[in-house]
Each structure stands twice: as C-alpha cells, then as structure tokens.
Design a protein with these regions (language model features):
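Formylglycine-dependent
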Residues: 1-43, 49-58
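Aromatic- and acidic-residue-enriched segments that line the glycan-binding/catalytic groove
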Residues: 53-69, 121-122
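Metal-dependent active-site segment of extracytoplasmic phospho-/sulfohydrolases and closely related
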Residues: 43, 48-49, 83-120
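Alpha-helix capping and helix-loop boundary segments enriched in small/acidic/polar residues
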Residues: 17, 21, 72-82, 116, ...
Length: 176
C-alpha cells in the first residue's frame, strides 16, 4: 500500500513501472511533455532526478559500460551520472526539435556536495553532504540559454538559487 503525506491511501499507483529505472522514466516523461506542449503557452519543467544518490543502483547494462576502467561502487556512480547526462541531452534535443530551445533557460544544479563516506569526493574541499563545511554546501551549477547576455564564463562567487529569480523574471519579459 502507498499513502500520501496526509496518510490517505493512494489507489492509482503505477505497478506496471516496477523494476523500471526511474532516471529513464523521468527523462521519457519530460521528453513527452516537451513534444506535446502547446507552444502558444508558457512552459515550465522542473525535473529532480534522484540520480546519483544512495543507493547507487543502476541497470546492469549501464554499469557494464564502465566495467573495463572503473571498479566497485564507483562504476555504478559513473553509470548513474552518465544516464542522467544522456537524459538531459535527450530533453535538450526535444526542446531543439520542437523549436523551443531559443526561448528556454536550462538550469542544472545540485543540492549539496558529495557524500564523502560513499563514492563521492569534494577534494580539495573539506566536508561533504550533511556538514556545514564547504565540501558539504558547495555544489555545481550551470545555466544555459540563448537569452543570456553573457555566456561562456565561470562564476566562482557565492550564490543561492533565490538570487536567480530577478534574472529569470527579466528574461521572461517581466519587471523584477
């Protein structure tokens, strides 16, 4: 049985998806949403992949791609990152093929540093997920859009996702 946050029984659980790798499911659904979008209306897609997260589980055929050069748990981690990267690429291709990329902002970010007790590394930073040290709170981000006035540079300043709101408003034609 499955229950929502209020304790109510959820009847419409997709049992036919049992055993499917959720990174593939999230990507396929996102591509479907892009392909079926009415382009006369605004479009917002928030995709929160669970990869690469503990437990480091991935279909065996994906992990096997790294078998010759990555050992142990890092093989699954590498495969998870690779499948996620390919998924982002498929979504970007769908946006391009549907004429939406020229008016799109893509933000890719993480919520914390790597968990140092597993396969991650934040070297040369100290700490990791769950700590307030820089290795725990610093994450990677990229922003891609033809709408940006300045591109192709690296910003190492401290920022938070809430700092972007005014920029996104301006790019959307609204006043911050």
């Amino acid at each position: 049985n499955y229950y929502d946050l209020d304790g109510n029984l959820v009847d419409n659980v997709r049992k036919d998806l049992k055993g499917k790798y959720n990174t593939y499911l999230y990507t396929d659904k996102s591509v479907e949403l892009v392909q079926n979008h009415d382009q006369t209306k605004p479009f917002f897609l928030y995709l929160a992949y669970t990869a690469p997260h503990i437990p480091h589980e991935v279909p065996e055929e994906d992990a096997d791609r790294f078998a010759s050069h990555i050992l142990g748990k890092r093989r699954n981690y590498a495969a998870m990152v690779s499948v996620m990267d390919e998924g982002v690429g498929k979504i970007a291709d769908a946006l391009t093929n549907n004429g939406m990329m020229e008016n799109t902002i893509i933000v890719f970010t993480s919520d914390n540093g790597a968990y140092y007790k597993s396969v991650g590394s934040n070297y040369p930073l100290r700490g990791g997920k769950g700590s307030f040290l820089e290795g725990g709170v610093r994450g990677v981000t990229f922003v891609h859009s033809p709408l940006l006035q300045k591109s192709g540079y690296t910003n190492t300043n401290l920022h938070h996702v809430t700092d972007w709101y005014a920029t996104f408003q301006k790019l959307a034609g609204d006043k911050p």
